[in-house]
Regions:
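Short amphipathic alpha-helical segments
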Residues: 264-271
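Catalytic cores of RNA-modifying enzymes
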Residues: 1-214, 242, 269
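An accessory alpha-helical subdomain
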Residues: 190, 194-196, 200-239, 244-259, ...
Length: 271
């Protein structure tokens, strides 16, 4: 079922499905944009797709046009019950009631979702860590938060960006104006893709992410002071900085993802 400006209120009112602020729900009501987002996923014949936070099914409608198996997951039982009725005759769409952060996502090769603000970082981290067969992910998030995942230096840079850049690459796709949603959020949204490299050593990348996560928890501390939590020995920290050609006075936001990988490998070899 296509969701658009003309039918949204009729459908939502008939099914008594008002947006829930607790779930950060803003429904996309521009089908042309929905189609662009789904097209950006580059779905291929054998892909297994998972959608998080389908709401009334704005993206699900276009996913259902493919012959691939798509699983849509939402924690809001109202939306789940609605979608189960809409797609009960479509064997390619599986509707699941669950918290995405408690869902087994390991089998899926493509991931898509309009992510609510309150779980954006947590959801993206969860997919990166657990969707081990994924090759591409396409998300829509509030534009003001995109830098957290795209930047590799500066005040918006953080551990999730480290993980993204060590597992693959990120690309900005397009911006969606606030008026394309109901209710309209306070800012525009950005659609972006994460491409996962199958040849990456996931274990090493995740280890580096854990180091970055710990260091960014004290982002105003210098790297040498931060590393005291790991090595407890100033001489060893000095040697690490010498061996890695790392300025000990740098702060976490000044360290590139590749250097976090080298720091992690060094720490693991000096346990």
């Amino acid at each position: 079922m296509e969701i658009n400006r003309s039918n949204f209120f009729e459908i939502a009112n008939k099914a008594d499905l008002k947006p829930d602020k607790d779930y950060g729900q803003n429904f996309l009501i521009e089908p042309q944009i929905c189609e662009r987002i789904v097209d950006a996923l580059n779905i291929e014949v054998n892909d297994k797709v998972i959608e998080v936070g389908p709401g009334l099914g704005s993206l699900t409608h276009f996913l259902s046009m493919y012959n691939n198996k798509s699983t849509v997951v939402d924690i809001d039982l109202r939306m789940i019950n609605f979608l189960k009725v809409v797609y009960k005759e479509n064997p390619n769409v599986e509707v699941v009631a669950n918290d995405i952060r408690k869902t087994d996502v390991s089998q899926y090769t493509k991931v898509i979702g309009n992510l609510p603000y309150n779980i954006t970082t947590e959801a993206i981290q969860y997919f990166l860590l657990n969707a081990t067969n994924a090759t591409r992910m396409v998300f829509m998030i509030q534009s003001e938060t995109l830098a957290h995942f795209y930047d590799v230096s500066g005040k918006e840079y953080g551990p999730t960006s480290v993980l993204i850049h060590l597992l693959g690459s990120i690309e900005k796709l397009f911006t969606v104006k606030a008026g394309s949603f109901y209710p309209a959020p306070k800012c525009s949204s950005s659609v972006f893709a994460i491409n996962l490299d199958a040849n990456v050593d996931r274990k090493s990348a995740i280890s580096a992410f854990m180091v970055a996560k710990a260091l960014f928890a004290n982002r105003r501390k210098t790297i040498s002071n931060n590393l005291m939590n790991y090595l407890k020995n100033k001489d060893t920290i000095n040697q690490l900085c010498i061996d890695l050609d790392l300025n000990p006075l740098l702060r976490p936001e000044q360290i590139a993802p590749e250097m976090y990988l080298r720091i992690s490998e060094y720490l693991n070899s000096h346990k």
